[in-house]
Amino acid sequence: MSAPQRRLPVYKKILEENKKKWMIKEFLEYRLSKYGYIDSEILKTPLGTRIVIYAERPSRIIGRKGAIVKEISNILTTKLGVENPQIDVIDISKIEAPEMFPKVVAYRIANAMAKGVRFRRVMFVAIRQLMEAGAKGFEIVVSGKLSTERARFEKQTYGKLYKIGYDAKNRVRRAVVHVLLKPGIYGIEVRIAPATLQYSDEYKIKPPVRPEAVQQQS
């Protein structure tokens, strides 16, 4: 870290660090979106910066003999000033069903539409996959010039899905993906309440436990 950065006030250091994290995430999504990139975590360590990439197809992100990872590491160092980046790629299927990640579902819909598949058919396929995966609730919105020259949207919802409040902001997963087709730009928004999610208003009252009867002494 340079001398001017050391003299920055604490709040400015925090803002600079968050800005750099945002720039790293934006770059990774731009560079790796077509290779199954889902999300990333950026952690500062004594040895440098550890970047954990969650992907649907890790082998495509790593590249042949690690070529893509090396390229990304070089760009992060030279262009974004990341100190000693250490990149790990994790297969999300080992953590949770891929269908529980809205970005996976949104990219599947976008890729199918880019191949000429009708949006309604793609939505129904995604709905079936989400239901089979056990999602607690979900919403899929496709917007654009769907059937006429005027832009509109079509929405499909299922199950219990909160749209406002703490749970909607912090627990319900959301992703937005855009795809450019011949008629124009289409937007795909996916919200998912994963199977393991427990809403704040969901609780169980345990039945009272009766104490064991005290045996009378003879």
From Swiss-Prot:
Residues 2-71 form the KH type-2 domain. One of its GO terms (molecular function) is structural constituent of ribosome. Keywords: Ribonucleoprotein, Ribosomal protein, RNA-binding, rRNA-binding. Pfam families: KH_2, Ribosomal_S3_C. GO terms for biological process: translation. It comes from the Archaea. The keyword Ribosomal protein applies. InterPro entries: KH_dom, KH_dom-like_a/b, KH_dom_type_2, KH_sf_prok-type, Ribosomal_S3_C_sf, Ribosomal_uS3_arc, Ribosomal_uS3_C, Ribosomal_uS3_euk/arc. The keyword Ribosomal protein applies. One of its GO terms (cellular component) is cytosolic small ribosomal subunit. Gene3D superfamilies: 3.30.300.20, Ribosomal protein S3, C-terminal domain. Belongs to the universal ribosomal protein uS3 family. Binds the lower part of the 30S subunit head. Part of the 30S ribosomal subunit. This is Small ribosomal subunit protein uS3. It comes from Pyrobaculum aerophilum (strain ATCC 51768 / DSM 7523 / JCM 9630 / CIP 104966 / NBRC 100827 / IM2).
